[in-house]
Amino acid sequence: MAAGRRVGPGPPSRPTMAPWKKKRLRKRRTGASQGRDSDSDDGEFEIQAEDDARARKLGPGRALPSFPTSECVSDVEPDTREMVRAQNKKKKKSGGFQSMGLSYPVFKGIMKKGYKVPTPIQRKTIPVILDGKDVVAMARTGSGKTACFLLPMFERLKARSAQTGARALILSPTRELALQTMKFTKELGKFTGLKTALILGGDKMEDQFAALHENPDIIIATPGRLVHVAVEMNLKLQSVEYVVFDEADRLFEMGFAEQLQEIIGRLPGGHQTVLFSATLPKLLVEFARAGLTEPVLIRLDVDSKLNEQLKTSFLLVREDTKAAVLLYLLQNVVRPQDQTVVFVATKHHAEYLTELLMGQGVSCAHIYSALDQTARKINLAKFTHNKCSTLIVTDLAARGLDIPLLDNVINYSFPAKGKLFLHRVGRVARAGRSGTAYSLVAPDEVPYLLDLHLFLGRSVTLARPCEEPSVADAVGRDGVLGRVPQSVVDDEDSSLQTAMGASLDLQGLHRVANNAQQQYVRSRPAPSPESIKRAKELDLAELGLHPLFSSCFEEGELQRLRLVDSIKNYRTRTTIFEINASSKDPSSQMMRAKRQRDRKAVASFQQRRQERQEGPADPAPQRELPQEEEEEMVETVEGVFTEVVGQKRPRPGPSQGAKRRRMETRQRDQEFYVPYRPKDFDSERGLSVSGAGGAFEQQVAGAVLDLMGDEAQNMSRGQQQLKWDRKKKRFVGQSGQEDKKKIKTESGRFISSSYKRDLYQKWKQKQKIDDRDSEEEGPSNQRGPGPRRGGKRGRSQGTSQPRASSVPAGRMRSELKTKEQILKQRRQAQKQRFLQRGGLKQLSARNRRRAQELRQGAFGRGAPSRKGKMRKRM
């Protein structure tokens, strides 16, 4: 019976299972393992199952909340971009980039760059720009302003577009800043697929024509070359949606008004405008020409303009000994491994100092605006790759240039404007690092130093004449104005004079640099009259050694220096009338009587001078404004901007009782008193572009009323005024440029005829590019067959242009993609998504598990090796 018993239909045992059943079981196991390791895309079925369970619990009468579907009855389509941004935002409170609702490619570029937490200016500006508002933003140097306008630009453009024309435009004042912006654009937008074109002066225009023919999404340019290319190509910027003015105040003040007007005239009406700089005035009437529409003002770090990690030192030296002091600083004060940037006034100073320092063994390079573009790139690359330790530049590199691992800045020529000082010293102490700024101040530059401290709201600290090194270190070296020991100047100057006597080239460069210094002194803006008056009151002859040098000398050397200073400052108490005169001499008696009469006046004068020397040289006292005046200032700012972010909050004083007593003792009626200048007058005057409130001539020029004549002769009379030229010894035109030819652009403005030289037409003929392929010829229905340019031609003449003659007029390159191109593009996009979410790792892990299961199963035979078809499947 046992032998004849039939087996039931239950599951067979493992050794006797058929191969086709094993294959089905393996598929089920593989599907289960994939379900465990799948990402969020494969979890839709689990979510649907949970929703079904919740629906069964709620009952048939209640519906679950869900996103609006495409079958909605509303006439307005749902804004999917806002929904995606809301979905991307973190539900919990977070201060990182996750809470801004950025798309995945943009967020991945941020993480790849290494940014974790946004800076204060990024946290304030990025959400406002994402809302589509015009923004005017100001924050101190090194605070991450470049990412503030790049990240919203990537989020707005999303991905590569098939439409013709650029959609974003970034304008920079200098080529180096544009190159740096291009570098950050490539790094942050690595995963967006956006194409960028760089339009810079000094590069070949043919390469820029080719770059614009590739239909870029973003154009990064300097204004002069962009206008040149736009006029040559008859370029239309009607598709631009997003415009950035980087270092906006520098763009509007360095003579780009004509170019900027032409660029703004080519832009469409509904574009978004963003202005960024480290120094921006509060009332941006000067930037009205940028086309701002209900802008939002964001000003951070208005009070603390300098970084806390930045240390400043001011050295009082003569103009002819600055080179010697610079050499001493580079060889003895600055560490050998540190990198230093030296700012000079003109390109002649840069060439002279480069040759001089190279002869003394200091490795250096120089950059100025007139230098060839290739040489500028080479010298900057040498400095950034630590091939040389010193870079001598003009104010070209003061704006926005981010040089990594920069430790020191030396102002060889002291800046004439406070905001220029901010941009210069802002090259160091960036992104949390520390740095030092040394400034060489000549006696005629002391008023500019006082103007700078008025602008910063700080006090000038003078070095004490006879101060011990321990006391000087305790007081601190930050912001101290002091002398340089004469022994240091003599030692370094002797070596420089020896080197100059042995080189005729150095002598010629030195002579040219001196002439350039005289031209610079005549052309630089004048300081304020208050600072000139206060500079005359300072007793610079009694100025002590700077703590930077007093700590480097021994006590014996310091005593010798003090003795030399006391001999130099010695003044006898007797006059010429009392020398070799007896007590009964009339001249001696007269001087004694005069000294007795003026004794009190002399004593009071000496006492006031002693008090001035003991106390710090404070800037002009900041007057406390009443509450009504502060409210009036806030209303003035809010009248210009729709929203103001980062206003200065009222901080309570240290002693409210003392302030109340001072208010009671004032002899002015606060209800009717109107101040003649606002509280932040000095700060805003330093930030101003046109220098309003500065020189008297500028104020007078603004108050002049120009009346137009009522006849053609009277209208042109003002343009024909002559002016005497001292060099030419004759009368010349007021501007001296009347003989230059002008051309009229599409926007109606007249620009120089040098912008139109038919370079683009020559390039198209050289590259064999047909005019009908370009976007300027009109829509596609006008590109049909028709007569060619030039009339009838023979067959032999047509062979000189092979492309134009070989392509028939009716067969043009179609912009519609074929089925194969669409499938190929979809496969590439699917492959990119597969790789971005880690599909390659999942696939390799799945293959390893499959191979392991096959080795364990082995079809019940236990053989370790596989042959034939099974081996191919593995």
From Swiss-Prot:
Binding site for ATP: 139-146
UniProt region (Disordered), positions on chain: 1-76, 581-687, 712-874
SUPFAM superfamilies: P-loop containing nucleoside triphosphate hydrolases
Record-given protein name: ATP-dependent RNA helicase DDX54
Reaction catalysed by this enzyme: ATP + H2O = ADP + phosphate + H(+)
Annotated source species: Mus musculus
The protein's Enzyme Commission number: 3.6.4.13
Biased composition (Low complexity): 636-645
InterPro entries: DBP10_C, DDX54/DBP10_DEAD-box_helicase, DEAD/DEAH_box_helicase_dom, DEAD_box_RNA_helicase, Helicase_ATP-bd, Helicase_C-like, P-loop_NTPase, RNA-helicase_DEAD-box_CS
